[in-house]
Amino acid sequence: MALPMLPGNSVNRNLGKDKFHKSQHFDYSNGVAMMVGTEKPGIGGDLLLGQSARAKYSRFPKGEGSGAPAWLAFDKQVLCFDAYFNEAVPQRREEKYRVRKCKIYFYLEDDTIQVVEPEFKNSGIPQGTLIRRHRIPLPAPKDDCFYNVHHFNINQEVLFYSRNFMITDCDPFTRNFLVKMGVRLNPPASTPADPYTTLRQELEENMKPLRPYERLDTLKQFLEHDRQVLRFYCYWDDSESMFGDPRELILHYFLADDTMEMYEVVPPNSGRDTVPKFLHRGKLPKHAPIPKRQPGEITDRTVLNVFGPVGQGGPYILDSLKTGALEEEFYKDSDLTIGAVINVWGRRVLICDCDYFTKEYYRSKYGIEDFPSISYKASPPPKPAKQVPPYTGFGSEEDSLCSCQGLLPKPPQKDFKKLMEKDRRGLVSNVLRFVGKMLTDSPVDKERVFIICFYLTDDTIAVFEPPQRNSGVIGGKFLERGRVKKPGQELFKSEMSEYFTAQDLYVGAHLLLNSQPFQLVDADDFTFSYMEQHADEFPKANIGTIISKVKSISEEQQKTVKQFFTMSDPSSTGSLPYESFRTLLADLDVELSEHEIMTLGRVYSVRQQPEVNVGLMLAVAQDHLKKKNFEKFSEMIQAFTHEDRDRCGQLSSKEARIICKAFRLPLSDDLLRALLEKFAGESEKIDYHAFLSGINWRENPVPAVLPEDTVKFDADWRGEAPEPAVKTINYSLLLEDVFGSATNINDS
């Protein structure tokens, strides 16, 4: 029972309120007074009658994933549904309705929908986009809302603008997306067949023409042989016509469409104009020239029984027998072979050769293996020798020749490659130096000694005469450096003169340098070594050639050689002096030059190691240690004694070297190794007491090293006779190489 509305029985609803404002519910919109605050609360924020409060927070929990907006999270993601709709066809006997298949695309980024109908052959209706992409509203009475993803399912109808679309299936992406959203998908439905389309298919299947239409399909040939061209080298003899001459042509056959084109190879200075093409690209008929045809005579197909209006859409029948059709024969790839003569619009062209690709094509397609080329080019006439005017005597011959080769004179070009290869490199001077004597009857000039230098960089020769005491001749430069002509040549001639080369200089050679005869009697060690290292350039220093000459002696001379060696070496030591060896070879009938004899002696000489002065080595070592202020000799004694387990006063060379390196002994490796070898005993162990005593510059100083005691490279060699480098010859080794096996001299 309710309480009566008396004072004290009613509840004051304003108790505890602090807001009593009124919301604006009425306003003008486009000049019309209307209610605009349907969503606004009443006085003090209380809800009006019939209003429901909107939840401040969602009832659904926040899921995992990115918080990106829908237009970014679902960009380029579209749901695709297969659907159809029935369209009524009034006033037609063949069909009452039409089943039209379509695709429904739902764009997740903005909930827009697009309906597209695929194109079907001979449908007779416009197809494509039926409903453009936009948001489609729901049917009334909810037309204020739009379709979203929850309104779509398989085997379900949707209504777009009063047209029912039956969704039958969807693609895998759509299916997975809907399942992940929790949508329970219906089983797929089948699309009913269109009655009229079925009838048309039955009629087309029953239609059997009397003959199949001729199909002209060149796409396959184009796709298989595109950019493949056969190249042939041809010859056309046009010498019978006036002002005609043989022509050289290049034929290109395009496999993509069986067309040809030809180019003419115009030789230089032929008097003919160069044209872009000799024959434009196109099919070449075999029986050319052909008469001109009327328009319509040559067509792809023959049309018979034309009736009705002529033009587009008019009926016609094709002639299956091709009565009266003109057939033209064109050249194919099978007609183009080497040796074949083709008719190029009345010109007989001979195919003489082809390139590698063309040969491979015919080999793979036709099995042709032999491609004999036909020689059609006449041998070019010999070029006339260029007449050069004779040398006038002014300047060098090279300079005069360059001035005759063009209107603008140019300086002669030097051999830059030879200059870079033979130029001086460090101590390698690439200069061959010989000792020469003047060939004259004057007793004063006979004793004069000359240094003849040959520079390999530019084949120049310089002669220097070293001064001799009490000779009465002032030494110095005898011949300026330059190229020297060989004797017996004319001065004023058109041909280039011959100059002395490096092969003309060897020990024993006679040279005529500017009308002055010289004989080369000796050379320095670098010259001998260089000529032996480049034996292919210097035959006088080729040991193989020299031995072959010695092998060519007769058997009597071989016995003479053996007897000479036996008499010269009674002790059978296998060696003899070089002078005796030289006398023996000079008497043989093999015509060995002095340089060849000296080369043979250098190869089979007995090498003797030069004695090293220990005092000089110790002086050099103490000088280095003194400059570096090295005084750790007592510590080194302790280190050597610690390593000497047997207390014998000796250590191996390896252990001594390790200790010296540990104390950073400031000596070079070569000097340290030589000192350790000198202080090694018979057991190849180092007497470290003697070694340390020898290098101790504090307690045992040795005399300082004098400048004349040091070994230097004599760059200013003056031709003095040094100590002979070859003293003794190992003739036993020589006999073994010459006669093929070691020979017992005493038995012979």
UniProtKB/Swiss-Prot annotation:
InterPro entries hit by this protein: DM10_dom, EF-hand-dom_pair, EFHC1/EFHC2/EFHB
Secretion signal, residue range per the UniProt entry: none
A single cellular component GO annotation: axonemal microtubule
The species this protein was found in: Danio rerio
GO biological process: multi-ciliated epithelial cell differentiation; regulation of neuron projection development; specification of pronephric distal tubule identity
Matches recorded under PANTHER family: EF-HAND DOMAIN C-TERMINAL CONTAINING PROTEIN, EF-HAND DOMAIN-CONTAINING FAMILY MEMBER C2
Primary location recorded for the protein, binned into one broad class: cytoplasm
Disulfide feature: none
PROSITE patterns from the UniProt entry: DM10
Domain EF-hand: 556-591, 631-666
Places the protein is found: Cytoplasm, Cytoskeleton, Cilium axoneme
Stated role: Microtubule inner protein (MIP) part of the dynein-decorated doublet microtubules (DMTs) in cilia axoneme, which is required for motile cilia beating.
The name this protein goes by in its record: EF-hand domain-containing family member C2
Keywords noted in UniProt: Cell projection, Cytoplasm, Cytoskeleton, Repeat
Pfam families: DM10_dom
Domain DM10: 75-182, 226-366, 428-535
